[in-house]
């Protein structure tokens, strides 16, 4: 890994590194994710041009995802902090498409598509759930008090 850094984005923890044009070893990613910092994923940042980077994202089990919003925020910050890009407006290329970001000090804002929602509710363990998608699937559950709900 080239210049690896531990980064956190709104509760998700990542190991972020510059992309090395080599085959990714899924087994190593799983070992690193399990043993290092209890991270959610490993992200490689590949320079495309002075305003654009490509994100190579791997979950902690070695699988990939089309979109990881918190990971994209970390990628943009990493790219700016490590002079991979030369602007605080960074485009991150992800499997879902190009995501525009804007960095102001330690805050990274992103533009994502409008979420889609399925109209039919699911009943899971007695809870009404709704499927949503912002590039990757989510399951939404409304509770009276999130702080008292046993996650």
Description of each model-found segment:
Residues 72, 114-115:
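Short, acidic/turn-prone active-site loops that include or flank metal/cofactor-
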Residues 95, 115-117:
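Zinc-dependent deaminase
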Residues 1-105, 139-151:
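A glycine-rich beta-to-alpha transition motif near the start of alpha/beta enzyme domains, typified by
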Residues 106-112:
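Short, solvent-exposed secondary-structure boundary/capping segments
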Residues 118-132, 139-151:
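Anionic-ligand binding region
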Residues 53-57, 92, 112, 122, ...:
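Generic detector of bulky aromatic hydrophobic side chains
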């Amino acid at each position: 890994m080239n210049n690896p850094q531990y980064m956190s984005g709104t509760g998700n923890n990542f190991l972020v590194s510059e992309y090395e044009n080599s085959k990714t070893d899924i087994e190593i990613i799983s070992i690193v994710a399990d043993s290092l910092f209890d991270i959610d994923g490993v992200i490689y940042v590949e320079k495309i041009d002075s305003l654009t980077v490509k994100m190579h994202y791997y979950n902690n089990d070695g699988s990939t995802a089309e979109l990881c919003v918190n990971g994209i925020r970390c990628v943009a910050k990493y790219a700016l902090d490590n002079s991979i890009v030369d602007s605080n407006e960074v485009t991150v290329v992800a499997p879902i498409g190009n995501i525009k970001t804007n960095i102001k000090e330690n805050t990274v804002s992103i533009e994502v598509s409008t979420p889609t929602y399925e109209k039919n509710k699911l009943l899971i363990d007695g809870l009404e759930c709704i499927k949503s998608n912002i590039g990757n699937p989510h399951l939404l559950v409304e509770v009276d008090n999130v702080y008292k709900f046993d996650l």
